[in-house]
Amino acid sequence: MTDKTSLSYKDAGVDIDAGNALVGRIKGVVKKTRRPEVMGGLGGFGALCALPQKYREPVLVSGTDGVGTKLRLAMDLKRHDTIGIDLVAMCVNDLVVQGAEPLFFLDYYATGKLDVDTASAVISGIAEGCLQSGCSLVGGETAEMPGMYHGEDYDVAGFCVGVVEKSEIIDGSKVSDGDVLIALGSSGPHSNGYSLVRKILEVSGCDPQTTELDGKPLADHLLAPTRIYVKSVLELIEKVDVHAIAHLTGGGFWENIPRVLPDNTQAVIDESSWQWPEVFNWLQTAGNVERHEMYRTFNCGVGMIIALPAPEVDKALALLNSNGENAWKIGIIKASDSEQRVVIE
């Protein structure tokens, strides 16, 4: 009888001990995100969360997203500590534009070979994003899949559930002629347009770690975490009659603003009302990118656009700016049957 080598899961490239070490490492940061409605802790087969009692007719709002190829840039530059904030931001910002308060978040982390330090940095960023948005990180999945990813490359995805009072859902139906548009400044490109960003870096031959822009490395501008607007917007909704909110993500101005406009309305954006942050000027120049393409691919310094009645504008601006946002009047809503839903002039 021939002796055969006894194989283990670890021999196949899956290290269960590393996975357990990761869980032990992140328990503390995850615990800090806990909301009173959450029942149980990490490790259950499913996460339990009650609905906050203040809602009379609660409606659940869900969203899922990733961070696109910003992740490739983060991996290339070995910066893993803020990509988790981006992941949460992409999900919770999509929820809050409908008036929803984020309740809980789950993440999916997949890699070819689990590096506990890298995964811990990413998940700590996710926990930080949850703290910024007031939602609980209730669980997730860490998948070590040898042969599916190159080396220690990884991918992340997020899923978030929020709640809104049925009578207070923001869906754009109240938008009308004469409404004013308020912009909320972005922290940079957020998590969109990074395939073009990487192409510009490649074609220009620029090293983002040694190239300086506004006194700091270009890499800092490109990897600045997506701004989370949840707490500022939720307070605004409580105190001001908000008609619509657009989150400027993939598709930029041209595709995201029309998503919240009723028929026979048009958003007119005043381009002179703000200056693009330098990173967008650099991208446009280095890539010779046309203006229309810039507004289709990037947020150009505007993370969200809020539509509200003209008499509410001063109150809204004061409230948003006092909460640390960079907010300004960016345009108006006009009655129009034009197929061009957004005009930038």
Swiss-Prot record:
Pathway in which this enzyme or protein is active: Purine metabolism; IMP biosynthesis via de novo pathway; 5-amino-1-(5-phospho-D-ribosyl)imidazole from N(2)-formyl-N(1)-(5-phospho-D-ribosyl)glycinamide: step 2/2
Record key words, sorted: ATP-binding, Cytoplasm, Ligase, Nucleotide-binding, Purine biosynthesis
Subcellular location(s) per record: Cytoplasm
Molecular function (Gene Ontology), one example: ATP binding
Entry's Gene Ontology BP terms: 'de novo' IMP biosynthetic process; adenine biosynthetic process
InterPro entries given in the database record: PurM-like_C_dom, PurM-like_C_sf, PurM-like_N, PurM-like_N_sf, PurM_cligase
Entry keyword annotation includes Phosphoprotein: no
GO cellular component, one term: cytosol
Main location per the UniProt record: cytoplasm
Gene3D superfamilies to which the protein is assigned, alphabetical: PurM-like C-terminal domain (3.90.650.10), PurM-like, N-terminal domain (3.30.1330.10)
Taxonomy, superkingdom: Bacteria
UniProt cross-references to NCBIfam families, sorted A to Z: purM (TIGR00878)
This protein's name: Phosphoribosylformylglycinamidine cyclo-ligase
Species annotation: Escherichia coli O139:H28 (strain E24377A / ETEC)
Gene name of the encoded protein: purM
